[in-house]
């Protein structure tokens, strides 16, 4: 399984399944997407509340300018506009996840919608979901931490087209890390 140039023979004796719980047949990608949607709904709820607070602050009688240099109301209106944009972005993210078509990537190259487990040369495993948006989001699924990546992120771009068992290098700054794609579905 490992034993290729990046990892060498030192890992032949390690049972990777002990390091990472491989996805069982009971792991349901629809369940993972639903957890992501739930977290995005919470993000939207918070964005709505923040927008309302910013609107209230912008229209409060105490923010009426007392002189030409008093910019509190103007600043509050900018904040309200920014918060409203956050609401729109959150609604768009939810639309994208709700309309996702669930695909199986077991025998296919990695693409948007794939669940991927990577192991680096230090035997550190991480789980990723390649989503249409919301990169940076982290969710708990099947007692595991899953990081949401987009195809636009450096790691997301590197993963696109890879298949289970492939190895690749990622250079970030002056550090190069080697990974193996252990699981894809």
Where are each of the predicted segments found?
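Short coil-to-beta-strand transition motifs
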Residues: 124, 172-177
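Non-DNA-binding regulatory cores of transcription-related proteins
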Residues: 104-169
